[in-house]
Amino acid sequence: MDRKDKARKNFSSSSSSSAASMAALAAAAAAGDGGAALPSPMEEDKKPRLVASSLAPVAGGGGGGSSSSAAVAAGASSSSSSSSVAAAARRGAGRAGGGAPSGGGGGPRCQVERCGVDLSEAGRYNRRHKVCQTHSKEPVVLVAGLRQRFCQQCSRFHELTEFDDAKRSCRRRLAGHNERRRKSAADTAHGENCRHADQDAGRSHQGTGNPPFQIR
């Protein structure tokens, strides 16, 4: 009976110790799961810092993109402003060149070389034909690199070979003018001859009583 009692005691003690060890293991496992599920306050504090640090490069990248876009826009605006300034400078230079005596802008100017007198205040004839009063009467002037003279009949410059001596009208216009004068003189003489003939015929028929025949 003593051996049976001892065996029972040993079994009960071993079973209780095993149960205690199992309970300890279960408690340890439960404690481990709870620690994994519920983070500590220090870990909670670290999380926003990690998130902020992870987002910092992204924000920096966005700022870099905006700064690069701003730099591109600034470069484009500066290039456009420089081109507008250059265009304004070219326009100013063109206006300055047009104001010179040899320029094509402004009012009419004398076409004689080394003259270029402004004819804005000159007479209508001089403005129309682009010649000053002095060079319109000069016997020899230089126009377009040629020795020429202003024709009073054509109102333009001709080379000296088209004039006779010191005449101020070209040979062709003088010939036409002389031809018209001769024709006009011939017509006048013919009319006078006809009129005298009519008068003579009338006087010859006065004694006969017949009316004179007249050509009208």
UniProtKB/Swiss-Prot annotation:
Report the induction information. Negatively regulated by microRNAs miR156b and miR156h.
Bias regions of kind Basic and acidic residues — which residues? Answer: 189-203
Q: Where is the composition biased (Gly residues)?
A: 94-108
Record's compositionally biased regions (Low complexity): 67-91
ZnF (SBP-type) ranges: 107-184
Reply yes or no: does the keyword Zinc apply. yes
The record's listing under Gene3D superfamilies reads: Transcription factor, SBP-box domain
Can you tell me which residues bind Zn(2+) 2?
151, 154, 158, 170
| Region annotated Disordered, chain positions | 32-110, 175-216
Q: In which tissues is it expressed?
A: Ubiquitous.
Q: Which residues form the signal peptide?
A: none
The alphabetical list of record keywords is: DNA-binding, Metal-binding, Nucleus, Transcription, Transcription regulation, Zinc, Zinc-finger
Which InterPro entries does the entry mention?
SBP-like, SBP_dom, SBP_sf
Q: Where does Zn(2+) 1 bind?
A: 110, 115, 132, 135
Location of the motif Bipartite nuclear localization signal: 167-183
A Pfam entry, by short name: SBP
Positions with biased composition (Polar residues): 205-216
Choose one Gene Ontology CC annotation of this protein and give it. nucleus
Keyword Ribonucleoprotein carried by entry: no
GO molecular function per UniProt: DNA binding; zinc ion binding
| PROSITE patterns, alphabetized | ZF_SBP
Q: What is known of its domains?
A: The SBP-type zinc finger is required for the binding to DNA.
Please give the function described in this protein's UniProt entry. Trans-acting factor that binds specifically to the consensus nucleotide sequence 5'-TNCGTACAA-3'. May be involved in panicle development.
The protein's name is: Squamosa promoter-binding-like protein 13
Species of the source? Oryza sativa subsp. japonica (Rice)
Q: What is the lineage of its organism?
A: Eukaryota, Viridiplantae, Streptophyta, Embryophyta, Tracheophyta
The gene name reads SPL13
